[in-house]
Curated annotation (Swiss-Prot):
Pfam families: Flu_PB1. InterPro entries: RNA-dir_pol_NSvirus, RNA_pol_PB1_influenza. This is RNA-directed RNA polymerase catalytic subunit. Residues 55-64 have a biased composition (Polar residues). It comes from the Viruses. Residues 286-483 form the RdRp catalytic domain. Gene3D superfamilies: 6.10.140.720.
Length: 757
């Protein structure tokens, strides 16, 4: 039977149908090949927006730099980055006037954080540019490599374990005449195998020492590596994103800590809160504007879009903001915070992998690395690429492009939000000094502007004034992409507001389904997603029940665990049928062992093992949850685990789900193919870290684990902890005198070895 799709909408209010227009079903688009072209686009565009600025040359690296600050006053409609310093300082002053003490208090909070943060803060995050190897690595490995190189070059402040001391080393490293680094490489040799007499390729791993002079080191320290942003829906073209190295990250973290603390105190800021809390905050602003515009005033809302937000922002502006916000603070604190924007003013963008050429006739492929783009003959490229390369050539140094203006995506989300909110703050009547006034919401580059005025002319005048004020701060509201509506209907950060927020359910679609971690986690995550959507996203009981049935079906097909009494034949059905027949209480079998599904929408919060525990045969319980069973995962399981959910919009979210350790919570083994690559050295490092961290956790179980405040190394902390525990155990009679003496002896030996080292 054919269904006319319009029939689906007869009973649905128009605003609820918005979900169906979102491009969120099916797989998102991924990028293939190199991001070099996208990165060149970003660099060229950024320079174009600031082209009337002043050119200077960096004395240390020789990089040409463009400074658009206080440049010509911007033209209408053309995006530009000519922010005016005095205007920025003035909006900051007004922001402080409306929120007395806001900067002062945030600085005090941040200073406390700065003094307590440990270096391991930098291990969070995924791919990071590792300057020692000149490519991306997991954050923990990149940090370890940096610290290792620092220590071998005599920089040891980081040994205290405090982030601020690591940053002292970073500053110190920039003054050094040269830095020695160790790089991993691999040699391939063709040799004849003795047994089979065939030729095989032998790989050997090597490490070689290399010295970087001051200029080369600075270039690497200031480099942001670029990649293509993956899985962006609803866009035709891909775009480049940046990942900074370890030298920059710590400084950025402290600036963002200050900015976050300020954003928390600003009612117009959509960051750092999320979800329902964010919706409540937004609803408050809308309510305020609507109640104040009862009969006499008109109220309109702009769903705003800014043109190329990051590419027109400028690190020099951020420096001015920080200088103002910290003006009464201690010198050391002001210095620490000003380093991030200074580094960004001197940043270099790494152009990625370069271009791949292939000749159809000769079946040849060759890679042109980014380093060669400065000198290669351009006749090999097509027109558009040739133009890009010609434009970027004057900026190239050692395969990286000098990129002084502009910020890269996602680096200073909080700080740029403060800048946006400071303009919204100017909309109060005491500042506009006329009949129109405005307020709104800002979340990084996304904004909604609510303008109230007695008549349409007033609304128009208010919007114009807002638009021009933005221009003075290097913010370019797009007249083409922003639209205005009577207040009550607008969109902000993919929340649709129509007299209240409408659930945009399509955004959650990608997280329904089987995650593919393991049988235990997948079951738990699947039902938690349904539960969360009933709470947060208007998922009604009937739909939830259907979602649950579809999920169970999907789960059974994924893991081939159809019910024991089914006719479906799979690879597992033989074993599952056998288990089914010898089980007395069949309701107690887990779904993944061919049991029935006992979930309904009322008990989604209970882990399946707990739900069925009373129904299980005793020997089944013993096999399923016996810690001596070699198939039960031996990690000490916390009661809560975290899954990373990829919603359709915004960053990956952490989602908590109940974790019960059973034979089904297996952890898949690492793919073997990495063992044959130059990453092998890295794997060794990773395993060593893993062992150290596991050992540390044994000494400080999470129940009693307070971060060691004060300055001690991991070893010192563990030794002192071992002594305390041993004494307590000895005095309470849990261990004998001989054992106690032996423990004390081992502790002394460890300390002695450390001293000799």
């Amino acid at each position: 039977m054919d269904v006319n799709p319009t029939l689906l909408f007869l009973k649905v209010p128009a605003q609820n149908a918005i979900s169906t227009t979102f491009p969120y079903t099916g797989d998102p688009p991924y990028s293939h090949g190199t991001g070099t072209g996208y990165t060149m686009d970003t660099v060229n565009r950024t320079h174009q927006y600031s082209e009337k600025g002043r050119w200077t040359t960096n004395t240390e690296t020789g990089a040409p730099q463009l400074n658009p600050i206080d440049g010509p006053l911007p033209e209408d409609n053309e995006p530009s980055g000519y922010a005016q310093t005095d205007c920025v300082l003035e909006v900051m002053a007004f922001l402080e006037e409306s929120h007395p003490g806001i900067f002062e208090n945030s600085c005090i909070e941040t200073m406390e954080v700065v003094q307590q943060t440990r270096v391991d803060k930098l291990t969070q995050g995924r791919q990071t540019y590792d300057w020692t190897l000149n490519r991306n690595q997991p954050a923990a490995t990149a940090l370890a490599n940096t610290i290792e190189v620092f220590r071998s070059n005599g920089l040891t402040a980081n040994e205290s374990g405090r982030l601020i001391d690591f940053l002292k080393d970073v500053m110190e490293s920039m003054n050094k005449e040269e830095m020695g680094i160790t790089t991993h490489f691999q040699r391939k040799r063709r040799v004849r195998d003795n047994m089979t007499k065939k030729m095989i390729t032998q790989r050997t791993m090597g490490k070689k020492k290399q010295r970087l002079n001051k200029r080369s080191y600075l270039i690497r320290a200031l480099t942001l590596n670029t990649m293509t942003k993956d899985a962006e829906r609803g866009k035709l073209k891909r775009r480049a994103i940046a990942t900074p190295g370890m030298q920059i990250r710590g400084f950025v973290y402290f600036v963002e800590t200050l900015a976050r603390s300020i954003c928390e105190k600003l009612e117009q800021s959509g960051l750092p809160v999320g979800g329902n809390e964010k919706k409540a905050k937004l609803a408050n602003v809308v309510r305020k504007m609507m109640t104040n515009s009862q009969d006499t005033e008109l109220s309109f809302t702009i769903t705003g879009d800014n043109t190329k937000w990051n590419e027109n922002q400028n690190p020099r502006m951020f420096l001015a903001m920080i200088t103002y916000m910290t003006r009464n603070q201690p010198e050391w604190f002001r210095n620490v915070l000003s380093i991030a924007p200074i580094m960004f003013s001197n940043k270099m963008a790494r152009l990625g992998k370069g271009y791949m050429f292939e000749s159809k006739s000769m079946k040849l492929r060759t890679q042109i690395p980014a380093e060669m783009l400065a000198s290669i003959d351009l006749k090999y490229f097509n027109d558009s690429t040739r133009k890009k390369i010609e434009k970027i050539r004057p900026l190239l140094i050692e395969g990286t492009a000098s990129l002084s203006p502009g910020m890269m995506m996602g680096m200073f989300n909080m700080l740029s939000t403060v800048l946006g909110v400071s303009i919204l703050n100017l909309g109060q009547k005491r500042y506009t000094k006329t009949t129109y006034w405005w307020d709104g919401l800002q979340s990084s580059d996304d904004f909604a502007l609510i303008v109230n005025a007695p008549n349409h002319e007033g609304i128009q005048a208010g919007v114009d004034r807002f638009y021009r004020t933005c221009k003075l701060l290097g913010i370019n509201m797009s007249k083409k992409k922003s639209y205005i509506n009577r207040t009550g209907t607008f969109e902000f950060t993919s929340f649709f507001y129509r007299y209240g927020f409408v659930a945009n359910f399509s955004m959650e679609l990608p997280s329904f389904g089987v995650s593919g971690i393991n049988e235990s986690a997948d079951m738990s995550i699947g039902v938690t997603v349904i539960k969360n959507n009933m709470i947060n996203n208007d998922l009604g009981p009937a739909t939830a029940q259907m979602a649950l049935q579809l999920f169970i079906k999907d789960y059974r097909y994924t893991y081939r665990c159809h019910r024991g009494d089914t006719q479906i034949q799979t690879r597992r059905s033989f074993e599952i049928k056998k288990l089914w027949e010898q089980t007395r209480s069949k309701a107690g079998l887990l779904v993944s062992d061919g049991g029935p599904n006992l979930y309904n929408i009322r008990n989604l919060h209970i882990p399946e093992v707990c739900l069925k525990w009373e129904l299980m045969d005793e020997d089944y319980q013993g096999r399923l949850c016996n810690p001596l069973n070699p198939f039960v995962s031996h990690k000490e399981i916390e009661s809560m685990n975290n899954a990373v959910m990829m919603p359709a919009h915004g960053p990956a979210k952490n989602m908590e789900y109940d974790a019960v350790a059973t034979t089904h919570s297996w952890i898949p083994k690492r793919n073997r193919s990495i063992l044959n690559t130059s990453q092998r050295g890295v794997l060794g490092d990773e395993q060593m870290y893993q062992r150290c961290c596991n050992l540390f956790e044994k000494f400080f179980p999470s129940s009693s684990y307070r971060r060691p405040v004060g300055i001690s190394s991991m070893v010192e902390a563990m030794v002192s902890r071992a002594r305390i525990d041993a004494r307590i155990d000895f005095e309470s009679g849990r261990i004998k005198k001989e054992e106690f003496t032996e423990i004390m002896k081992i502790c002394s030996t460890i300390e002695e070895l450390r001293r000799q080292k």
